[in-house]
Amino acid sequence: LKNFDNTRVYPNDNNNKWIDHLAKKKYFSFLIDEKYGGIKLSTNELSNLLTKIASVDPALGVVTMVPNSLGPGELLTKYGTEEQKDYYLPKLAYGSMIPCFGLTGPNNGSDATGSIDTGKVVERDGKKMIKVNLNKRYITLAPVANLLGIAFRLEDPDNLLGKSGVTVALVERNHPGLIQNTHHNPMNAGFPNGTIKGEFYID
């Protein structure tokens, strides 16, 4: 941490190198159980560690905090199937997957679910799928993430799945129809921030 320089994190060309370095050092695994390769910390331990990291540079604190609070790691731990945990959690723990959590958009911020994006259950090629329309912005780590937790309001007019309401899905980078190539730089904050957009189908 002593050698950290926030110009290396965002937005210059060394961005990916530094994010990759933090991930490989397991800085993003503090909520993941050891059985999956993580460094499971208590809430107090995590708070103390993030405080120390942020004292070196606030941007570095944000880069480290987001995967260890919002998003796929904790959601998978609490709500994921065993198959999902076995597939995703080791990749998150060892840094081959960098997560972000897409919630906010042009019409929803502090009122996070007020005008949230939508996903509609449809039949496509004989399969039940969800057609998602996304317009997310100000998503921390979006420019560098390769595993995206995306929140949307599920619409199921024909009751194909049996439930509607706000839900979260996991989508990997380069999913057909997903657009993930815009950077924001809010107030020169010094951390990767951007948009998640697109219209696409998920199983």
For each predicted feature, which ranges?
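Short beta-alpha junctions and helix-cap segments that line functional grooves
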Residues: 88, 115, 135-137, 180-185
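Short beta-turn/strand-loop junction motif enriched in small, turn-promoting residues
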Residues: 35-37, 106-107, 136-139, 153-158, ...
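Flexible, small-/acidic-enriched active-site or ligand-binding loops
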Residues: 176-201
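A structural signal for short hydrophobic beta-strand segments in well-ordered beta-sheet cores
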Residues: 119-121
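Active-site-adjacent elements of ketosynthase-type condensing enzymes
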Residues: 108-115
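FAD-binding core of FAD-dependent oxidoreductases
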Residues: 57-74, 92-108, 135-148
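Amphipathic, small/basic residue-rich leader segments at the start of a protein or domain
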Residues: 1-67, 80-87, 91, 96, ...
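A short core secondary-structure module
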Residues: 128-178
